[in-house]
Amino acid sequence: MESVLNFLTNINVIFTLLGYLIGGIPFGYALMKIFYGMDITKIGSGGIGATNVLRALQSKGVSNAKQMALLVLILDLFKGMFAVFLSKLFGLDYSLQWMVAIASILGHCYSPFLNFNGGKGVSTIMGSVVLLIPIESLIGLTVWFFVGKVLKISSLASILGVGTATVLIFFVPYMHIPDSVNILKEVGTQTPMVLIFIFTLIKHAGNIFNLLAGKEKKVL
Protein backbone atom coordinates (compact mmCIF):
# COMPACT_ATOMS: atom_id res chain seq x y z
CA MET A 1 0.00 0.00 0.00
CA GLU A 2 2.83 2.36 0.89
CA SER A 3 4.52 1.78 -2.48
CA VAL A 4 1.24 2.60 -4.26
CA LEU A 5 0.89 5.83 -2.27
CA ASN A 6 4.49 6.76 -3.01
CA PHE A 7 3.85 6.18 -6.71
CA LEU A 8 0.66 8.24 -6.74
CA THR A 9 2.26 11.12 -4.85
CA ASN A 10 5.39 11.16 -7.03
CA ILE A 11 5.60 14.60 -8.66
CA ASN A 12 6.54 13.08 -12.02
CA VAL A 13 3.46 10.85 -11.99
CA ILE A 14 1.26 13.73 -10.84
CA PHE A 15 2.39 16.02 -13.66
CA THR A 16 2.12 13.28 -16.27
CA LEU A 17 -1.48 12.64 -15.20
CA LEU A 18 -2.12 16.38 -15.06
CA GLY A 19 -0.75 16.73 -18.58
CA TYR A 20 -3.09 13.97 -19.75
CA LEU A 21 -6.10 15.64 -18.12
CA ILE A 22 -5.24 19.08 -19.50
CA GLY A 23 -4.73 17.63 -22.95
CA GLY A 24 -8.03 15.81 -22.60
CA ILE A 25 -10.09 19.01 -22.27
CA PRO A 26 -12.32 18.74 -25.38
CA PHE A 27 -12.60 22.38 -26.39
CA GLY A 28 -14.01 21.59 -29.83
CA TYR A 29 -16.70 19.35 -28.38
CA ALA A 30 -17.60 21.81 -25.61
CA LEU A 31 -17.83 24.88 -27.85
CA MET A 32 -19.92 23.07 -30.45
CA LYS A 33 -22.30 21.83 -27.76
CA ILE A 34 -22.60 25.16 -25.97
CA PHE A 35 -22.97 27.49 -28.97
CA TYR A 36 -24.56 25.28 -31.61
CA GLY A 37 -26.08 22.32 -29.77
CA MET A 38 -24.09 19.96 -32.00
CA ASP A 39 -22.23 16.79 -31.01
CA ILE A 40 -19.06 17.07 -33.06
CA THR A 41 -18.13 13.44 -32.32
CA LYS A 42 -21.12 12.35 -34.42
CA ILE A 43 -20.44 14.62 -37.39
CA GLY A 44 -17.97 14.15 -40.24
CA SER A 45 -14.82 12.37 -39.12
CA GLY A 46 -15.96 12.47 -35.49
CA GLY A 47 -12.81 14.35 -34.52
CA ILE A 48 -12.95 17.20 -32.01
CA GLY A 49 -10.30 19.33 -33.70
CA ALA A 50 -10.50 22.50 -35.75
CA THR A 51 -10.81 20.83 -39.17
CA ASN A 52 -13.90 18.81 -38.30
CA VAL A 53 -15.40 21.79 -36.46
CA LEU A 54 -14.92 23.94 -39.57
CA ARG A 55 -16.45 21.37 -41.91
CA ALA A 56 -19.38 20.72 -39.57
CA LEU A 57 -20.22 24.41 -39.23
CA GLN A 58 -19.76 25.13 -42.93
CA SER A 59 -22.13 22.28 -43.77
CA LYS A 60 -24.76 24.06 -41.65
CA GLY A 61 -24.08 27.42 -43.27
CA VAL A 62 -22.75 29.02 -40.08
CA SER A 63 -21.27 32.42 -40.95
CA ASN A 64 -18.52 32.43 -38.30
CA ALA A 65 -17.35 28.86 -38.99
CA LYS A 66 -13.74 29.87 -39.67
CA GLN A 67 -13.52 32.01 -36.53
CA MET A 68 -14.83 29.19 -34.34
CA ALA A 69 -12.46 26.67 -35.93
CA LEU A 70 -9.55 29.06 -35.35
CA LEU A 71 -10.56 29.43 -31.70
CA VAL A 72 -10.61 25.64 -31.30
CA LEU A 73 -7.18 25.38 -32.94
CA ILE A 74 -5.71 28.03 -30.63
CA LEU A 75 -7.22 26.48 -27.50
CA ASP A 76 -5.99 23.00 -28.45
CA LEU A 77 -2.53 24.41 -29.12
CA PHE A 78 -2.37 26.34 -25.86
CA LYS A 79 -3.53 23.46 -23.67
CA GLY A 80 -0.49 21.46 -24.81
CA MET A 81 1.74 24.46 -24.21
CA PHE A 82 0.20 25.07 -20.78
CA ALA A 83 0.78 21.48 -19.65
CA VAL A 84 4.48 21.70 -20.50
CA PHE A 85 4.72 25.22 -19.07
CA LEU A 86 3.51 23.91 -15.71
CA SER A 87 6.12 21.15 -15.74
CA LYS A 88 8.81 23.74 -16.44
CA LEU A 89 7.45 26.07 -13.78
CA PHE A 90 7.73 23.36 -11.14
CA GLY A 91 11.22 22.36 -12.23
CA LEU A 92 10.65 18.94 -13.75
CA ASP A 93 13.59 17.45 -15.60
CA TYR A 94 13.64 18.15 -19.36
CA SER A 95 13.12 14.49 -20.24
CA LEU A 96 10.09 14.38 -17.96
CA GLN A 97 8.73 17.51 -19.62
CA TRP A 98 8.64 15.40 -22.78
CA MET A 99 6.58 12.82 -20.90
CA VAL A 100 4.11 15.55 -19.95
CA ALA A 101 3.98 16.69 -23.59
CA ILE A 102 3.26 13.17 -24.81
CA ALA A 103 0.64 12.73 -22.08
CA SER A 104 -1.15 15.91 -23.18
CA ILE A 105 -1.17 14.69 -26.79
CA LEU A 106 -2.62 11.34 -25.74
CA GLY A 107 -5.16 13.21 -23.63
CA HIS A 108 -6.40 15.10 -26.67
CA CYS A 109 -6.56 12.00 -28.85
CA TYR A 110 -8.07 9.77 -26.16
CA SER A 111 -9.92 12.18 -23.91
CA PRO A 112 -11.05 10.78 -20.54
CA PHE A 113 -13.98 13.20 -20.78
CA LEU A 114 -15.25 11.68 -24.06
CA ASN A 115 -14.97 7.96 -23.35
CA PHE A 116 -11.39 8.05 -24.65
CA ASN A 117 -12.31 9.49 -28.04
CA GLY A 118 -10.84 12.71 -29.39
CA GLY A 119 -8.98 14.25 -32.29
CA LYS A 120 -5.77 13.66 -34.22
CA GLY A 121 -3.74 15.87 -31.93
CA VAL A 122 -1.68 18.06 -34.27
CA SER A 123 -2.57 21.39 -32.64
CA THR A 124 -1.78 19.93 -29.22
CA ILE A 125 1.43 18.39 -30.56
CA MET A 126 2.66 21.75 -31.82
CA GLY A 127 1.66 23.50 -28.63
CA SER A 128 3.26 20.94 -26.33
CA VAL A 129 6.64 20.82 -28.08
CA VAL A 130 7.08 24.52 -28.81
CA LEU A 131 8.57 25.12 -25.34
CA LEU A 132 10.82 22.07 -25.68
CA ILE A 133 12.21 22.52 -29.19
CA PRO A 134 11.17 26.10 -30.06
CA ILE A 135 13.25 26.57 -33.22
CA GLU A 136 12.13 23.30 -34.79
CA SER A 137 8.54 23.82 -33.67
CA LEU A 138 8.19 27.37 -34.97
CA ILE A 139 9.51 26.33 -38.37
CA GLY A 140 7.16 23.34 -38.30
CA LEU A 141 4.25 25.63 -37.41
CA THR A 142 5.15 27.91 -40.31
CA VAL A 143 5.14 24.96 -42.72
CA TRP A 144 1.84 23.74 -41.25
CA PHE A 145 0.09 27.08 -41.73
CA PHE A 146 1.67 27.78 -45.14
CA VAL A 147 0.72 24.39 -46.62
CA GLY A 148 -2.75 24.63 -45.08
CA LYS A 149 -3.25 28.12 -46.49
CA VAL A 150 -1.96 27.38 -49.98
CA LEU A 151 -3.05 23.79 -50.62
CA LYS A 152 -5.99 23.79 -48.19
CA ILE A 153 -5.41 20.14 -47.31
CA SER A 154 -5.41 19.92 -43.53
CA SER A 155 -3.99 16.40 -43.22
CA LEU A 156 -1.06 17.11 -45.54
CA ALA A 157 -0.31 20.36 -43.73
CA SER A 158 -0.37 18.53 -40.40
CA ILE A 159 1.92 15.72 -41.52
CA LEU A 160 4.40 18.11 -43.15
CA GLY A 161 4.36 20.46 -40.16
CA VAL A 162 5.13 17.77 -37.59
CA GLY A 163 7.45 16.05 -40.06
CA THR A 164 9.46 19.24 -40.58
CA ALA A 165 9.96 19.71 -36.84
CA THR A 166 11.01 16.06 -36.57
CA VAL A 167 13.56 16.29 -39.39
CA LEU A 168 15.01 19.48 -37.92
CA ILE A 169 15.84 17.85 -34.58
CA PHE A 170 18.56 15.95 -36.43
CA PHE A 171 20.20 19.25 -37.40
CA VAL A 172 19.28 22.09 -35.01
CA PRO A 173 20.73 20.46 -31.83
CA TYR A 174 24.18 20.59 -33.44
CA MET A 175 23.93 24.37 -33.75
CA HIS A 176 24.81 26.87 -31.03
CA ILE A 177 21.51 26.82 -29.13
CA PRO A 178 20.91 26.80 -25.35
CA ASP A 179 21.19 23.39 -23.71
CA SER A 180 17.75 23.96 -22.13
CA VAL A 181 16.09 23.53 -25.54
CA ASN A 182 18.56 21.04 -27.02
CA ILE A 183 16.91 17.62 -27.06
CA LEU A 184 20.17 15.86 -27.92
CA LYS A 185 22.07 17.46 -25.03
CA GLU A 186 19.28 17.05 -22.45
CA VAL A 187 17.79 13.67 -23.41
CA GLY A 188 20.57 12.17 -25.50
CA THR A 189 18.21 11.05 -28.25
CA GLN A 190 15.65 12.41 -30.69
CA THR A 191 13.33 9.47 -29.96
CA PRO A 192 10.49 11.41 -28.21
CA MET A 193 9.82 13.59 -31.27
CA VAL A 194 10.28 10.69 -33.66
CA LEU A 195 7.65 8.72 -31.72
CA ILE A 196 5.30 11.71 -31.86
CA PHE A 197 5.73 11.89 -35.64
CA ILE A 198 5.08 8.15 -36.03
CA PHE A 199 1.95 8.59 -33.91
CA THR A 200 0.90 11.46 -36.20
CA LEU A 201 1.27 9.20 -39.24
CA ILE A 202 -0.78 6.47 -37.57
CA LYS A 203 -3.57 8.90 -36.67
CA HIS A 204 -3.59 10.15 -40.27
CA ALA A 205 -3.37 6.70 -41.91
CA GLY A 206 -6.79 7.06 -43.55
CA ASN A 207 -5.90 10.53 -44.79
CA ILE A 208 -2.63 9.25 -46.25
CA PHE A 209 -4.48 6.59 -48.26
CA ASN A 210 -6.90 9.26 -49.49
CA LEU A 211 -4.01 11.54 -50.44
CA LEU A 212 -2.36 8.79 -52.45
CA ALA A 213 -5.68 8.07 -54.16
CA GLY A 214 -6.32 11.77 -54.81
CA LYS A 215 -9.49 11.66 -52.73
CA GLU A 216 -8.53 13.78 -49.73
CA LYS A 217 -10.99 16.60 -49.10
CA LYS A 218 -9.82 20.20 -49.03
CA VAL A 219 -10.71 22.70 -46.32
CA LEU A 220 -12.49 25.61 -47.97
From Swiss-Prot:
One of its GO terms (cellular component) is plasma membrane. Belongs to the PlsY family. It is an enzyme of class 2 (transferase). Its EC number is 2.3.1.275. This is Glycerol-3-phosphate acyltransferase. It comes from the Bacteria. Probably interacts with PlsX. Catalyzes the transfer of an acyl group from acyl-phosphate (acyl-PO(4)) to glycerol-3-phosphate (G3P) to form lysophosphatidic acid (LPA). This enzyme utilizes acyl-phosphate as fatty acyl donor, but not acyl-CoA or acyl-ACP. GO terms for molecular function: acyl-phosphate glycerol-3-phosphate acyltransferase activity. SMART domains: G3P_acyltransf.
